[in-house]
């Protein structure tokens, strides 16, 4: 029924079959549930483009014909496809009743490799599509809104976090050349700022995780204590994206 409304592609509710396995699989699960409920569902209500995630999506034959096949071969081809649709004005919808159950990684090594590929893929999309997306942001109506939404989605926000850490590191290093009383004050202020930033980041992610788990409670196959317990580890899961994002900047990544 959703596809018959004229969409060029339709994405789904992405659930997980192994939420309860450990904090890693739960971290993935919470992220994808949040994506479905609080990103794609509102986008559909507002009439803007959704973005596909993973392999659980449907594509119209006319899209394949218009593109002469499937020309999306970056490391995150799902995001590449979503961005391209926004730029071309093709519509992606969301079907809440179409559910897929992914099996998420359960070891940090598996998770590192997968998210390293995703991070590299996002950088590739940024390189190829930032300018077209920016131009698209100035179009009227749904087209401009969809381009702006995708631009914010793929913007390298983690790099801003890394730059903040680097900047504070430079401040700490520079203060070592200052008199002791001044260096002590600078160190105190800088460390306090960084500690506050980390705490606010943790609390914000904790809130996102809690709201997601509570809203999707009946869809999560896990004991209540596991659902709530893994909310506490969700921010830690997200923190691990920081070293992954750094590695993706310099490391060669392939399928």
Predicted feature locations:
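Membrane-embedded alpha-helices of multi-pass transport/permease systems
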Residues: 1, 243-250
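Basic/Trp-rich segment in TM-proximal cytosolic loops or flexible interdomain/linker regions
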Residues: 46-47, 106-234, 249-255
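Short, hydrophobic alpha-helical packing/hinge segments within bilobed ligand-binding/sensory domains
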Residues: 81-82, 111
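Long helical/loop segments within the catalytic core of UDP-sugar-dependent glycosyltransferases
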Residues: 2-75, 116, 120-127
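Catalytic cores of eukaryotic secretory-pathway lumenal/extracellular enzymes that build
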Residues: 54, 94, 101-113
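Structural detector for helix-capping/boundary residues
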Residues: 61-62, 79, 98
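Catalytic donor-sugar/metal-binding loop of nucleotide-sugar-dependent glycosyltransferases
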Residues: 47, 73, 82-100
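Hydrophobic, well-ordered secondary-structure elements that form the walls
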Residues: 239
